[in-house]
Amino acid sequence: IISHGDGRVDPESLSGFVAAYQTVTALKLGELWAIPIMIRLALIENLRRAGARIASDRVDRNRAHEWAGQMMETAEKDPKSLILVIADMARSNPPMVSAFVAELARRLQGQSAALALPLTWIEQRLSESGLTIEQLVQSETQQQAIDQVSMSNSIGSLRFLAALDRREFVEA
């Protein structure tokens, strides 16, 4: 119920879930009372997974932010040394994941011509996997939207379950 509705549990989905299950096997009274608790646990796990993904992406975005900052500062103060910063980044083998690439592209695109060089390097690295910067930026945007919807649905569902009259639920 949690994965199919992306964390959204409402009266209709909850009663449909219970009714569908009971077409196979009738639930005992204790099992009916436990359903809201089990769904709460599943929603909390859904929030944990989304939170862990968001935290991991934040680490990648921070890493990109730091590299972009170094490159922008170097391009402004000592443009000839920019290639050394790019080489340092390349040696650090940054993760070519959507959060890192999207943040680096966001910070560097449209800056100076010199700052197009690290983006060209990333584009080359991504092309080895059949990807582009644009694809990863789009993927990152979609993932952020998915996480936002999942978090919102899960929190709303927890509120719904907190307000649920369990006696009425079990008797229905």
Predicted segments with their positions:
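Active-site activation/catalytic loop segments of kinase-like enzymes and analogous catalytic loops
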Residues: I1-L32, P36-S56
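Basic, amphipathic N-terminal segments
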Residues: A52, R61, H65-A172
